[in-house]
Amino acid sequence: MIKKISVRKDQLALLSRNGDYYKVLHAGEHFLPWFNTPEVLLITLDGSEVPDVLADYLRRFQPDWVEKYCLVADLSETEAGALYMDGILLEILLPSTRRLYWRVEDDLTLVRMNTQQVPVQTEVMNAVLQPRRKGVVKGRDAILTVQVPAWHVGVLKIDGETQALLPPGLTAYWKINHLVETEVVDTRLQVLEVSGQEILTKDKVNLRINLAANWRYSDVLLAFSQLTKPIDHLYRELQFALREAVGTRTLDELLEDK
């Protein structure tokens, strides 16, 4: 007696005995001996990931099958991967990933990217941000996106070092193997209020004073390269200036200068 199996056009059948895979059957009807019948593992060629145990076996004992039927996603410590199906980004693979995927003709592709080049490719950034029905792209947390509006600039720091300013627009950066920080800065004229300052005049009169100062950045890059938080620094400087201006004068002198 014989056993018949049917393999669809989008499938493979892997035959094994005692856990050893020895033959691949393609689409069609196949007849297997009833006695000592091999085990049959039906594989759907849908771009899915090959389970780790099977992937390790194929790498060791059937490398020709890996080359013919699988997409190999072995990434170095400085590589990320963009996995596409039919031109649609499915997943961002992290460095040191080691996976196999079942091929779907030429519809499954992997784009390798060097994460030492911190800016992310524009096409990958756009694909990550594109709205989709099935949720967000898996692995997108490896990418930092920065939106800088009009009349603003972005301050980019990589591993603690301030880089060139970012113009208005959208950019993205790898958070892998680097500490990437950004801050969006308004370059327009702004108002900073120093409220409720209680200060003694030179003649010991207690005054409660509010101060409003108009200001804007003259050199954003210089400010952020020298100061961690420029606005906090400006606030303290205004406090000191106010205390010096009031504390070194009598009340009458202040009223005269008013």
Regions found by a protein language model. Give the residues of each.
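N-terminal hydrophobic membrane-entry segments
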Residues: M1-K258
